[in-house]
């Protein structure tokens, strides 16, 4: 029905729009209908050394976002809380088994409390509805937090990703052979675990099964069987089979791919004599990684990067200079040549399958073939998440799996071009990239000052290690615990001090205490209901303030990131906090500085913590509105009700946390938007001009770039927003008028004269 309405709207829109058209608009529409397929096209490339405004704004370092609107997420969160046992598998997946059992116990206790209350409605209704509202609120917030994983397929993403990487290298087996001999002909030994055995070992050890390709120089290959976890030594496949497979595959390559492969082979043959020795294997590995990273980036973009030959030539000439000083030129043996041709053909076929992650797939297999270190695997997966977002592991697939993956991601609206452009924006950050930029930074080792070429990731890694080593305070955790205990005992304390004075408290009996604790005659159902309410209030309130403490810790870490970043250009403070130091005396240094700024701003939890803070902000506004309405209804009797006192306690505690978050957020913004750093660097440039007049032109260029950077930061930086919501201006003004009008009415009623706290800006 909705689609028919949209079609009808589009039809009528075109119908009435036809009466407004002139000849020029009709001709343009006809040209657009014909399309641009017949237009001449040239091969192009994207310059990876340039930056986009997204890099300064921070959107280049994309974070995971939900594909479902917040209204649907709220509805699903409420349903999953109300029918908690029916969604047990989902709750176990997004939390853990122990937490699920604890939450299930709280859920069952809440159901029992509701049943007992409806049987004997004697207890105050606020004591029953309070925990229920907290449970619904936190369940909805948690559903909003984990919403980025809803569209992902369930199961072990690591194993699925590695299965697709294997198919990337081997190609589609159905097009070559129907049996396992195709893998043997390719000379690639893959390790696949049986479903039962693999799941057993994954459950037992908690590690991903790795497929290892080890091509040894002594004619053997080492395979690891996932079923028994024992190495199996196999003889290398004969070279004629590899050559026959390569000859058969050459006929399937396009002319452009064949020329590209031959160009890389010609570049590689020039130094193969120097790189074939065992002692210089590291240089050969760097050459292969460099070749694949450059060609992989060009194949991802669908463009031919014409400048890669010159880049490769410079890198390979450097490697030749390093190796010719040690070794004389020797003729490459037939084994090395066959292995090089085999790897080149396998890589070309992987890029031909149309996958955006082909170069990274072979890069990972190359690293896995050198060693079985878990650190390199973890680092590679982190790079995958950085360069291609959270969808990368499920998006890298071969042609044969396209339908299967599309069915898994039927609800995903992610444009595949987004990953391509994201890679180009971040291509210069990759360590194996020829365009990776480094800055000459100063580090201190004791009292010694040393220089070191560092990249953005290395500098940010040092900053993050300093932040992680920072001793966090526990003041707000203690505040949350105190408020939790106070709210749990509040109904009992309110009845106790309301009905008993200080003299009567000295001679109070246990039966009277039990009666005051229950709020009714202490019969068995009432006692059970009171104990359940106390336990529910204690646990759920602690969980709520625990989430608030997590948000406060995250904001504190953001502030520390910004603080250490602002100290990078200060020699004294950089030495004090043991972080790298460099000046903005070159254009490349400014580029690194801007990129590091955006990178650190996007590190750590972002959307998940913003969801928590936004929920707390809206809860605070709601409680403030309710309190104002209660005061306006009767300010003399406002404090007679226990729930009004409870509202005031909640409002005071939430305001303390929000003030803390607001102060940390504003200070973080000030650190990142500190224009005085750029102005100081401009002064330093003028000082250098005075000392080195021969470099005046170069320093003037850097000074102009600094001025542009200052203007750009002022243009893009926005003030800190605590609520983290993208709110319509009309809705925002209405909400502000309603809340501030209520506060104005309360103050006017208490003080005796009219006062206005709001003013609508046009």
Curated annotation (Swiss-Prot):
This is Protein PHTF1. Its main location: endoplasmic reticulum. Residues 365-376 have a biased composition (Basic and acidic residues). It is a multi-pass membrane protein. InterPro entries: PHTF1/2, PHTF1/2_N. GO terms for cellular component: endoplasmic reticulum membrane; Golgi apparatus. Interacts with FEM1B. The keyword Glycoprotein applies. It comes from Bos taurus.
């Amino acid at each position: 029905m909705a689609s028919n309405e949209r079609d009808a709207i589009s039809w009528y829109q075109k119908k009435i729009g036809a009466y407004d058209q002139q000849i020029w608009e009709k001709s343009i529409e006809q040209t657009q209908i014909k399309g641009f397929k017949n237009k001449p096209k040239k091969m192009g490339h994207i310059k990876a050394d340039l930056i986009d405004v997204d890099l300064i704004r921070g959107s280049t370092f994309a974070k995971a976002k939900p594909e479902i609107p917040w209204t649907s997420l709220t509805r699903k969160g409420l349903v999953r809380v109300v029918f908690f046992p029916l969604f047990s598998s989902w709750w176990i997946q997004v939390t853990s088994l122990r937490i699920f059992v604890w939450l299930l116990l709280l859920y069952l206790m809440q159901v029992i409390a509701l049943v007992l209350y409806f049987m004997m409605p004697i207890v105050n209704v606020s004591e029953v509805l309070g925990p229920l509202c907290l449970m619904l609120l936190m369940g909805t917030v948690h559903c909003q937090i984990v919403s980025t994983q809803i569209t992902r397929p369930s199961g072990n993403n690591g194993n699925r990703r590695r299965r697709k990487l294997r198919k990337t290298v081997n190609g589609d087996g159905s097009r070559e052979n129907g049996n396992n001999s195709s893998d043997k002909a390719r000379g690639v030994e893959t390790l696949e675990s049986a479903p039962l055995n693999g799941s057993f070992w994954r459950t037992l050890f908690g590690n991903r099964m790795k497929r290892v390709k080890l091509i040894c120089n002594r004619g053997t290959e080492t395979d690891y069987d996932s079923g028994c976890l024992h190495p199996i030594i196999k003889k290398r496949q004969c070279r004629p089979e590899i050559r026959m497979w390569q000859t058969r595959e050459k006929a399937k390559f396009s002319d452009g791919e064949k020329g590209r492969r031959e160009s890389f082979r010609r570049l590689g043959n020039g130094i193969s004599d120097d790189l074939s020795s065992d002692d210089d294997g590291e240089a050969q590995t760097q050459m292969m990684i460099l070749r694949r990273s450059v060609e992989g980036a060009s194949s991802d973009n669908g463009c031919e990067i014409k400048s890669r030959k010159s880049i490769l030539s410079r890198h390979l000439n450097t490697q030749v200079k390093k190796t010719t000083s040690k070794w004389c030129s020797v003729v490459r043996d037939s084994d090395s040549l066959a292995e090089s041709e085999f790897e080149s053909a396998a890589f070309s076929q992987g890029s031909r399958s149309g996958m955006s992650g082909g170069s990274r797939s072979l890069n990972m297999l190359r690293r896995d073939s050198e060693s079985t270190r878990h650190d390199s695997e973890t680092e590679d997966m982190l790079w995958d998440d950085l360069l291609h977002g959270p969808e990368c592991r499920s998006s890298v697939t071969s042609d044969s799996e396209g339908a299967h993956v599309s069915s898994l991601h039927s609800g995903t609206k992610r444009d595949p071009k987004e990953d391509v452009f994201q890679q180009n924006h971040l291509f210069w950050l990759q360590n194996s990239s020829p365009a990776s930029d480094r800055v000459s930074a100063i580090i201190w080792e004791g009292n010694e000052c040393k220089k070191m070429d560092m990249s953005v990731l290395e500098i940010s890694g040092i900053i993050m290690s300093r932040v992680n080593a920072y001793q966090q305070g526990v003041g707000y955790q203690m505040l949350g615990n105190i408020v939790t205990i106070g709210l749990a005992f509040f109904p009992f304390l309110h009845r106790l001090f309301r009905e008993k004075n200080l003299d009567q408290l000295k001679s109070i009996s246990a039966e009277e205490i039990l009666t005051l604790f229950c709020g009714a005659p202490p019969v068995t159902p009432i006692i059970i209901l009171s104990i359940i309410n106390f336990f529910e209030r204690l646990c759920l309130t602690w969980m709520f303030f625990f989430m608030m403490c997590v948000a406060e810790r995250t904001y504190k870490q953001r502030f520390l990131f910004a603080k250490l970043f602002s100290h990078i250009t200060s020699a004294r403070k950089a030495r004090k906090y043991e972080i790298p130091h460099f000046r903005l005396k070159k254009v490349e240094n400014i580029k690194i500085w801007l990129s590091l700024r955006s990178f650190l701003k996007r590190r750590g939890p972002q959307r998940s913590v913003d969801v928590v803070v936004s929920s707390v902000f809206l809860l605070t506004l709601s409680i403030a509105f309710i309190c104002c309405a209660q005061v306006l209804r009767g300010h003399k009797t406002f404090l007679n009700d226990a729930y009004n006192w409870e509202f005031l306690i909640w409002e005071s505690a939430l305001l303390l946390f929000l003030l803390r978050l607001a102060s940390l957020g504003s200070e973080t913004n000030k650190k990142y938007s500190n224009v005085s750093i750029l102005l100081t660097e401009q002064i330093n440039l003028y000082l250098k001009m005075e000392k080195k007049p021969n470099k005046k032109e170069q320093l003037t260029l850097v000074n102009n770039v600094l001025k542009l950077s200052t203007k750009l930061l002022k243009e893009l930086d926005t003030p800190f927003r605590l609520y983290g919501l993208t709110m319509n201006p009309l809705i925002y003004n209405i909400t502000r008028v309603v809340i501030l009008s209520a506060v104005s009415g309360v103050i006017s009623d208490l003080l005796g004269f009219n006062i206005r706290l709001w003013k609508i800006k046009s």
